[in-house]
Amino acid sequence: MSEKILEIKDERLSFFTPAGEVKALNGVSFSMNQGDVLGIVGESGSGKSVTAYSIMGLTAYPGRLVGGTVWFNGHQIDKMTEKEFRKIRGNEVSIIFQDPMTSLNPVYTIGNQIVEVILLHTKKTKQEAWARARELLELVGINEPDRRLKQYPHELSGGMRQRVMIAMALAC
């Protein structure tokens, strides 16, 4: 039997606006075992992204979890401080954002952004991090990785930017 790695129980999340409370999630519950693949489908605005962001602890103000629990690997992550969460975010749990152009920083090269993630979550040296970044680009099917590491997000196609996001998620 597989080990349960993620469990969402009766998650409720609201956005508190000047016009009042907007309930974005109301009773979301699911669990995943190691090796599971989960597809969340729904209409635009149905809460798919809000669910993913809440699991990652990335709910933007004025959003707030108002009920339920989020468990990851036996830890109740919805009660973690930002400092505690930062230790697992990107290291044990990652998200691949739908629109890489809004997630990649336009003023830094692809290489700098991947290396930053590696250095933040591993004990690798800068040289080792650059070598790992190159390996990751190859792993996700980006040709000419040495050249791509020096490029900026706007210089890559949408599909290549998405692959860069996948490489960043795999970096740790």
What are the functions of these language-model segments?
Residues 1-172:
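ABC transporter nucleotide-binding domains
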